[in-house]
Amino acid sequence: MDFLLLLLLLASSALAGLASWTVSRPETVQGIKGSCLIIPCTFGFPANVEVPHGITAIWYYDYSGKRLVVSHSRNPKVVENHFQGRALLLGQAEQRTCSLLLKDLQPQDSGSYNFRFEISEGNRWSDVKGTVVTVTEVPSVPTIALPAKLHEGMEVDFNCSTPYVCPTEPVNLQWQGQDPTRSVTSHLQKLEPSGTSHMETLHMALSWQDHGRILSCQVSAAERRMQKEIHLQVQHAPKGVEILFSHSGRNVLPGDLVTLSCQVNSSNPQVSSVQWVKDGTKLKDQKRVLQLRRAAWADAGVYTCQAGNAVGSSVSPPVSLHVFMAEVQVSPVGSILENQTVTLACNTPKEAPSELRYSWCKNHALLEGSHSRTLRLHSVTRADSGFYFCEVQNARGRERSPPVSVVVSHPPLTPDLTAFPETQAGLVGILQCSVVSEPPATLVLSHGGLISASTSGEGDHSPRFSVASAPNSLRLEIQDLGPTDSGEYMCSASSSLGNASSTLDFHANAARLLISPAAEVVEGQAVTLSCRSSLSLMPDTRFSWYLNGALILEGPSSSLLLPAASSTDAGSYHCRAQNSHSTSGPSPPAVLTVLRAPRQPVFTAQLDPDTAGAGAGRQGLLLCRVDSDPPAQLQLLHRGRVVASSLSWGGGCCTCGGCFQRMKVTKAPNLLRVEIRDPALEDEGVYLCEASSALGNASASATLDAQATVLVITPSHTLQEGIEANLTCNVSREASGPANFSWFRDGALWAQGPLDTVTLLPVSRTDAALYACRIVTEAGAGLSTPVALNVLYPPDPPKLSALLDVDQGHTAVFVCTVDSHPLAQLALFRGEHLLAASSALRLPPRGRLQAKASANSLQLEVRDLSLGDSGSYHCEATNILGSANTSLTFQVRGAWVRVSPSPELQEGQAVVLSCQVPIGVLEGTSYRWYRDGQPLQESTSATLRFAAITLSQAGAYHCQAQASGSATTDLAAPVSLHVTYAPRQATLTTLMDSGLGRLGLLLCRVNSDPPAQLRLLHGSRLVASTLQGVEELAGSSPRLQVATAPNTLRLEIHNAVLEDEGVYTCEATNTLGQTLASAALDAQAMRVQVWPNATVQEGQLVNLTRLVWTTHLAQLTYTWYRDQQQLPGAAHSILLPNVTVTDAASYRCGILIPGQALRLSRPVALDVLYAPRRLRLTHLLESRGGQLAVVLCTVDSRPAAQLTLSHAGRLLASSTAASVPNTLRLELWEPRPSDEGLYSCSARSPLGQANTSLELRLEGVQVALAPSATVPEGAPVTVTCEDPAARPPTLYVWYHNSRWLQEGSAASLSFPAATRAHAGAYTCQVQDAQGTRISQPAALHILYAPRDAVLSSFWDSRASPMAVVQCTVDSEPPAEMTLSHDGKVLATSQGVHGLAVGTGHVQVARNALQLRVQNVPSRDKDTYVCMDRNSLGSVSTMGQLQPEGVHVVAEPGLDVPEGTALNLSCRLPSGPGHIGNSTFAWFRNGRQLHTESVPTFTFTHVARAQAGLYHCQAELPAGAATSAPVLLRVLYPPKTPTMTVFVEPEGGIQGILDCRVDSEPLASLTLHLGSRLVASSQPQAAPAKPHIRVSASPNALRVDMEELKPSDQGEYVCSASNALGSASAATYFGTRALHRLHLFQHLLWFLGLLASLLFLLLGLGVWYAWRRGNFHKLRMGEYSVEMVSRKETTQMSTDQEEVTGIGDDAGSVNQAAFDPAHLCENTQSVKSTV
């Protein structure tokens, strides 16, 4: 439809041109490859031109050149093949339209297109100018038009246009980034001869939120896209204004530094004004940050901030500031009288939160139940006087108000008048009167109606009187007491509110009791009590002693001695003296206090009986009491954690802050009570109560069973058989982690698993039992109280039995029992006659029939049996679930012996034998008893009793009864009594004869009837038994011989070996019980033999040999152990040729038998003695004040060395037998400068001696920082130099960061307002007459808000474009940094939040944040904002990312393996482009390599030597440009490692093994000894040993062995590996190398000595030749020599032929003698003249 409209437009345009020959078409048209385009075209001609045969329309391509036909309306065949099917003429020529549609565009279609139309001969027209068509590969960037200025609320149109129009394949324009709820889009296509275009319009109503918004318009055609972005700059008033509170989440305390920051989310332009308002009143401060340096009461209120700019302003939401503090207001104000009501209000500043909780304390004691804001004291008394304060608390903390004093005025109470004489310094009497009164009372002391003293000053001013007074106190001291001073004294107290008085009868001759050494002593200490009196000592003087008012002693001694005071001696003592003339008054009481250590605490842990049971409301009680004076400090521990303590935690008046909410702690002297509400599983277990005081400690434990584990049976505890039952273990616990449940039935383990429920389906009678459950968690375990499960079922068939009871008379007992639940009702019948029933027992109490009923049992006793009692008896059982019955026939028989309780007896039982006849007992009947056929003469009654039967009384008993006057006897059948007993007195004896036969003997014996079965076990293996035949036991092993007898078992082991060792157990069992006896057999089959002795001196030869007797020698594995550590190898012996202290250990050999545990021999301790060594002398100084100096001397020596410590040649201390071995400690309290100097320590033992010394210097000078070492900027700071030893005049020299600052007599530096420049280390130097002393540096830290923020950026384009944005700031404490881009947070100092483009990597350092962003377009100039904030304030800065300049790009990368091809390209900002006549210079490590005209530097095979820093310099027509350097890393596998061995030359005790390798990247190094990993460059990869120290550095691994043990010697292999390969090397490390080194040194010494000898001989020969030469020169006429040349050798013939060299000087002689070339030259003959 749109296309038809376009054609109509073209047609209308054609009508306008009818008046002339014209062609209208655009000058240019653009298209995209693969798409299409339209050239809109209209033409016209004069109206007078006739059209006889129509109009021919023709389009040409390159009309002025090739003139190719594109379209022909009459003859399509002439169209060029290139345009066939792709060019289409739109419209009809008769309508004057000539538009051309060109499809499937190709770049070759670019060029000029011309239109020609032909009407007839002579009427033709061609458009010569034509239309230029441009076809590109990708679309051009669309054009966006927008207003120059944008502001909030404005409605604006954004037009996005493109020149591409294609009707067949639409060209799409699309807006992105807008808010669809506030915007609409519309589009418009233009297709006119004047030109073609496509426009998309975005209509938006702007909001402040659109500021910074990125809008993009994207054109898409032919599957290709191109877009353009615009960044909106919308002007608006500040938005999102809010206040950031520095104390968010915590309380603002008085004096805190509070910071309020006015934060603005968005503002354009920037905020220009800030106005702070508090409680509606404007503040003077107009900065973004409002600081309250010391928060106070007046600072509380509601704060708002108003931020404005040129557009407008906005106000933040109000923020309430509450200063967390309190003060107490007392009402009424002024004097408070008794019985008044006093109100104390706990006031807080404004904006106090509603969740505040209040507590009140009086005199630092918590007032229970007072938790409201006001405390009301009704009808106050003097007891209410005191200091009160309130405590406010919320979830963030607690704060206490200043205390206020409440004073209750009241009249004077009865005065306290006391008197005592003082006899130590003459006769002095002291009278003391004190009273409780408010206001203070006036005190008057009178005697005999006369005023002796008063607080007002009136009274008798006798020179013997001395008066002292204080508020509410008066003291009178009377010198030279006399009889007139005795009598009644009165003390009167008066005030404006009332009067009071008291009297005292004073005796001037009263005694005085003194306690020595003190009135308070420690238990066990001796105490002396002395009685002093004014009486003259006479022979008849006697002293009476009283304790707590009771007379305890009377005698002539004036002293009472308690040799060892105990707690029973504590109390109130007084004494009295008397003689024949007079009696003294009683002494004032004196209290003796005996201090004692805590006794054993009485500790109970239980549930409160009132709340015990399952469910909520339970309460656990822990109560610990102790007897201690002084009171002990108590603390309760549970699983090693302190849960309560009598000490105050936190210093508050309330209960300890460390207790959790369910726990309440009550404290009293020597008592600690803990209440646990709703105790959980974690609260159960053993608690320990510890009592401690300065005199000792004691403890007691108790177990708390909180019943946190409860077993519940549903649907009920009582169920009918066949119903389902669920057993659930309900556990009250705090943790919710995994748990394991164990189920117990009748005390035995029944089931286990993770489920807390067990189901019985269906339940049966066998399930009836007592059940319990147990939970096991990480926090602990808990066992429930057993619960009984009752199962109901109908009666089974009853069991009916008849027994002859011989208890009383001829009696039969019928017993009917049944199994049923609930219990059954039983009834017993003879025939149809009911005899007895369990429900109705109506039989006569003394009748012949007696019935007894119990649960499911009915017993009928029939006495005086007769034949009529014979017959059929049956029993019926009935309950609610059913019934059953059974019957039997009973026949009465003759006389018998009745035995009670049974003929089968256990030893010690009581037994009664009765002789019974069926007709009953007649009077006068005689009885005789027989045992084993022998009459018992001692028994003639009808009964025979044994109170406790013994084995000797067992046998066959019968009785004979004969009635009086009858000749016949009734003889009973014999009854046999058998006495049995359980096994007892079992013994197992083991004996070992280690002689030649190595015989082991085991003998087991026991007493038992019936005889016990004896079993002898070796471990769990049965080796002998009384049930086996002798032949069978003997055949089991030829070395074993077994012998058996009743209750006896004997085992002989011949040739005992290792396998026979172990624990043997003898079990003795019969029907009455069992007993065990165990014994260990030590066959002594394995032991360690030490030669020459187990105690040797260091350096001796020691041999340890194992001896073993075994039958499986080939199957055994032998091991050696040293201090429980297994040694490598399985040698028969260990040879220590040169034993060292490291060999001192416990040795034992072990044998491992297949299938059995390891067996070890008895350990043998090898003790190595050595002389003192490693002598160390150290000192420690107290860190603060220098009050204590400790000098410590330690040594390594065996036997322990005698240590002596001396100072300046003077012996100070020496070790004794009671000292810690090899340690001597000297403590110097309050050290003085004279204590400084050289200290020497000497260690002596029988094997040697060692000495060392130490210079002691005292650090008495210190720097103190007040108020703290860390203060905010602007706060006052004082730096003080403290030197206790300073003596005036003193000079103080100050240094700041090691630089001189000032000097003078002032010991302090004061900074009224600290700045950053004041931060640093301060040191002071003190100079006085004693010398110069200097302190250690003390660091001062200054806190300040962020400032000097810098945002910088650069490009890192080594492989792909990467932008680096870096933000730095100056801040203390370090700032929290946020980096954002166009309003979106990219990264913070906590990590990456989100990136607008690419993937980012964040690097964080102190006050520095760096963001690396990949794939950022180099034209990106968007703004980055960095916000820095700490607790003191914030600052922000912004910057733009500058376009990228010349840079180096590496392909395939900058980290390449060795041998790889590599290209380094010098990229220009505009890309490869046209480089013209540019040249490129390349540099490596700053040195120029070469210059080329191409921007690429090629490496065919890169080598490791070519690694380094590269950069390029481009010489362009516009000038030179240099890139940033890039680092090229060449990667290669490790080379063969280099291993170096160092061994201590003196003895090989210490050694170093060093392994190094060359590789890139760094290699991972490992060091192996055989298969054992010794060291690795990876941390904690190898197990650390105490004597091995491993240090790793890049491509290096070093092992230091302080003690080179035999197990550490051998072939070491060093392996190096990285991602490209690995390599290894091996070397020997041990004393063998040291031995070879010694041999090599000896060889060198020998060769050197030999060479020296040869040189000496050669020198002597040269000297001898020289002397001979000179001698010949002196003998003129005998020899003459003519020199031919310098290089010739002269040969002389004499009687003795000699070869000598003659030259100008002696040097030529040496050359001839030592240079072999001279010996090889051709000699020439010369003439000699004699």
Curated annotation (Swiss-Prot):
Ranges facing Cytoplasmic side: 1664-1730
GO CC terms in record: early endosome; endocytic vesicle; late endosome; plasma membrane
Disulfide bond entries: C36-C166, C41-C98, C160-C217, C262-C305, C346-C390, C433-C491, C531-C575, C624-C689, C729-C773, C816-C875, C915-C959, C1004-C1066, C1193-C1241, C1281-C1324, C1367-C1426, C1466-C1512, C1555-C1614
Membrane association type: Single-pass membrane protein
Chain ranges passing through the membrane: 1643-1663
Range of residues in the leader sequence: 1-19
GO biological processes: cell adhesion; clathrin-dependent endocytosis; clathrin-dependent endocytosis of virus by host cell; negative regulation of phagocytosis; symbiont entry into host cell
Domain Ig-like V-type: 23-135
Subcellular locations according to the entry: Cell membrane
Domain Ig-like C2-type: 139-227, 238-316, 317-405, 415-505, 511-593, 601-705, 708-790, 798-893, 897-976, 983-1082, 1083-1165, 1172-1257, 1259-1335, 1346-1442, 1443-1529, 1537-1630
Glycosylated residues, chain numbering: N339, N499, N726, N730, N1103, N1138
Location of the region described as Necessary for PRRSV virus attachment to alveolar macrophage in the Swiss-Prot/TrEMBL record: 19-150
Keywords for the protein's UniProt record, in alphabetical order: Cell adhesion, Cell membrane, Disulfide bond, Endocytosis, Glycoprotein, Host cell receptor for virus entry, Host-virus interaction, Immunoglobulin domain, Lectin, Membrane, Receptor, Repeat, Signal, Transmembrane, Transmembrane helix
Residues that bind N-acetylneuraminate: Y63, R116, G122, N123, R124, W125, S126
GO molecular function, one term: virion binding
Extracellular-side positions: 20-1642
Chief location bin: membrane
Pfam families: C2-set_2, I-set, Ig_2, V-set
Domain note: The sialic acid-binding domain is essential for efficient PRRSV virus attachment and internalization to alveolar macrophages.
Family as reported in the entry's similarity comment: Belongs to the immunoglobulin superfamily. SIGLEC (sialic acid binding Ig-like lectin) family.
Its biological purpose: Macrophage-restricted adhesion molecule that mediates sialic-acid dependent binding to lymphocytes, including granulocytes, monocytes, natural killer cells, B-cells and CD8 T-cells. Plays a crucial role in limiting bacterial dissemination by engaging sialylated bacteria to promote effective phagocytosis and antigen presentation for the adaptive immune response. Mediates the uptake of various enveloped viruses via sialic acid recognition and subsequently induces the formation of intracellular compartments filled with virions (VCCs). (Microbial infection) Facilitates porcine reproductive and respiratory syndrome virus (PRRSV) infection via inhibition of type I IFN transcription.
Subunit structure, as described in the record: Interacts with TYROBP. Interacts with CLEC10A. (Microbial infection) Interacts with porcine reproductive respiratory syndrome virus glycoprotein 5.
Protein's name in the database: Sialoadhesin
Gene source species: Sus scrofa (Pig)
